[in-house]
Structures are given as C-alpha cells and as structure tokens.
Swiss-Prot record:
GO terms for biological process: translation. Gene3D superfamilies: 3.30.1370.30, 3.30.1490.10. It comes from Gluconacetobacter diazotrophicus (strain ATCC 49037 / DSM 5601 / CCUG 37298 / CIP 103539 / LMG 7603 / PAl5). Keywords: Ribonucleoprotein, Ribosomal protein, RNA-binding, rRNA-binding. This is Small ribosomal subunit protein uS8. Belongs to the universal ribosomal protein uS8 family. SUPFAM superfamilies: Ribosomal protein S8 (SSF56047). InterPro entries: Ribosomal_uS8, Ribosomal_uS8_CS, Ribosomal_uS8_sf. The keyword Ribonucleoprotein applies. GO terms for cellular component: ribonucleoprotein complex; ribosome.
Length: 132
C-alpha cells in the first residue's frame, strides 16, 4: 500500500487506538517514525515502543499507549507539516502549544526534538506535529 503521508498515518493510528482504549497499536517502521516515537516517549506521552521484524526487510513498530486514571494521556495529536505544505519555524517564532501544556515535535539538524529540547538547543526546523 502506498501512503502519501506515512507519519500522518502513524499519528492517526495512535489517535484511533487511544480513542478505542487499546493498550498498544502497530505501524510500519521507519527511522523518522521511530524518532518521533522516541520524542513522544521522552515527553511522557507513550509508555514505549519496540521494533518487531515480521520478515526479512519488513518491520513494524509496536507502540505502547499510556493512560492516566483510564483516560488517554494524548488528548489531541495533529500533523502540522504535510507533504503538500511543509511548515518550518525558527525557534523564536515557534508558538507554545496550549500555553506550554502541549508539545510540538520538530525535525531539526540535530534530530527529531520536542519544542522544549529545540529551545534549549536554540535550533529550529520542520514542525512535524503537535501533541496535547
């Protein structure tokens, strides 16, 4: 299956699994997806993830979702920069998500970082998604 936006597909799988109260979900593996999941794990939005090999050359990511008192930790997760319209931001121009309660995930020259990590490193980049 050909996807025009693989990262958007993974974010949709996470959103749907959380709404259905699943403990975990799976998505095809890629380096960008794994890096975004690592940033979400560091920020406390998911419990963890693991790469599983299905067969030679084909892998998937198993994403362990996180809940607090039975409610999903991720209330909203949206793709910002899309294949048809890329969104780049200097770090000084990057707005805070819900006045600092949420997180933006950026692809920077230093790797995939949360907005707080990017501000500390003073580096901007492509705004991949916003999470609250």
């Amino acid at each position: 299956m050909s996807l025009s936006d693989p990262l958007g597909d993974m974010l949709t799988r996470i959103r749907n699994a959380q709404r259905a109260r699943h403990a975990a979900c799976v998505a095809p593996a890629s380096k960008l997806r794994a890096n975004v999941l690592e940033a979400l794990r560091r920020e406390g939005y998911i419990r963890g993830y693991a790469q599983e090999d299905l067969r030679k050359g084909v892998a998937q990511l198993r994403i362990e979702l996180k809940y607090l008192d039975g409610e999903p930790v991720i209330k909203e997760i949206h793709r910002v920069s899309k294949p048809g319209r890329r969104v780049y931001s200097k770090i000084k121009e990057l707005p805070r998500v819900y006045a600092g309660l949420g997180v933006s995930i950026l692809s920077t020259p230093r790797g995939v970082l949360s907005d707080a990590e990017a501000r500390a490193a003073n580096v901007g980049g492509e705004v991949l998604c916003r999470v609250f």
